[in-house]
Amino acid sequence: MAGIIDLASLAPTDTVLKLPHPYLTEYTVQRSDDKLFQLHPKEGSTVQPLPFALHAPHVRFSAPADLKSSELPASANNSLWARSRRSPFSDVRWESDAAAPTLAQAWLLLYVLFTVRPGMELVRLQLSGPGADVLSQQLREVLLGIAHPPPPPKSQAAAPEQATTETSSTVVVLRSTFWQGAGSPFGPRPVWCPDASPSSLPASTPLSQFPTTPLQHTITVASAGDPQDPDRYQQSLHPIRPAKPAPGAVIYSRWVPHLKETFSMVSVDYTDAEHLRLFHEWQNDPRVSQGWNETGTLEQHREYLRKIHEDPHQVALLAKWDDAYFAYFEIYWAKEDRLGGYYDAQDYDRGRHSLVGDVKFRGPHRVTAWWSSLMHYLFLDDPRTMWVVGEPKDTNAIPVMYDLIHGFGLEKFVDLPHKRSALVRCPRVRFFQLCPLGAQEKAVGGVNIGLVPKL
């Protein structure tokens, strides 16, 4: 299967996982006996010290493995019990004289398991050691997992999971809740979304330390964006939006295993010379201007970015691989956007526009990584976002195909003032069912319907 990493094939120095910004700690796995592994931080890799020990050197675990075909439930049985039994399992053990791993340490182990087997919707953790029952309960209470369900009455002949005791417990871990941030160890924000507060708040009390921005509606009257009728406006009723991240803040960071690089997004600072230079050079590239039509002088581009900076419904971003900037994105709240006038927009729908400025970073193996990461951020940033939307030109097949790969559906066609667009939408539930964060096949997300090879 695509994306699977064989733990046994990794050298002791190979990085299996790297934490997001600002820590960037790398981890390796080493064999402890014939079938079990231990996780170790790579010496000298940490950029910012962790607030606590995140790895448990005394814990051993097995690579995710599947039951023998003779042990699997009948394929016609699609109960939660049967789906759990068909999911891979991992043995997690610690000695009788050792403390159980903390919830944060268990989270790190799960991050490794979902990295080496990204296709697992569920994984059964078989916990063995003192305090296994408490750790199992903690995993359930932060919704990283659920109790292993009992077999249905007609399946009682099947062997049930071992009963929970103080030293033994089985918990079914959910990929969908893991990637939504369940159990993230560094505060209320999911680990891939560093605290990106407005500049007015001190670092000691970032925006995430306050309750989620309350719901309070307002009315916006804005240009309808019609070049044939510049005096036409549209009105929208929408929530007052959360404060925007400070210019220059890293708002998303994730290590991409198949590239062995960290993808990050940074809030654009229009007063920063490098940020302005990149935007200016890319927009004046004929390849980019064909789609964006934003060629101009340095001053015109500074003014363009300044207006976005002052617009509560938009955020301008630069994206990078490790330390190399390669792309520019604009993300927006859809209800008060031009697009919001063309469909029944929900209060927290979000959309995005993108361009790759550095041609060295083109290609499907990279596009699928940043495409999914940008969607991931939009769903994580505010848990009330139920839909991510887009409006690529109806004749521009490539972005529509990438959208289909990552869980979007084609809703309808809309006639914007300057183009006919395909209105595409991806619901939150579908994105986290698919979790398309690894290397993706050229097929419609979740089904084996192939797409044309020109990607």
Curated annotation (Swiss-Prot):
Q: What class of enzyme is it?
A: transferase
Q: What is its EC number?
A: 2.3.1.-
GO terms (molecular function) for this protein are: N-acyltransferase activity
Q: What happens when the gene is disrupted?
A: Leads to increased sensitivity to oxidative stress and iron-starvation, reduced conidial germination as well as reduced virulence. Impairs the production of the 6 siderophores beauverichelin A, dimerumic acid (DA), Na-dimethyl coprogen (NADC), fusarinine A, fusarinine C (FsC), rhodotorulic acid (RA) and tenellin; but increases the production of mevalonolactone and eleutherazine B.
Q: Quick check: keyword Repressor in the entry? A: no
- Which Gene3D superfamilies does the record cross-reference, listed alphabetically? 3.40.630.30
Q: What is its main location?
A: other
For this entry, the protein name equals N(5)-hydroxyornithine:cis-anhydromevalonyl coenzyme A-N(5)-transacylase SIDF
The scientific name of the source species is Beauveria bassiana (strain ARSEF 2860)
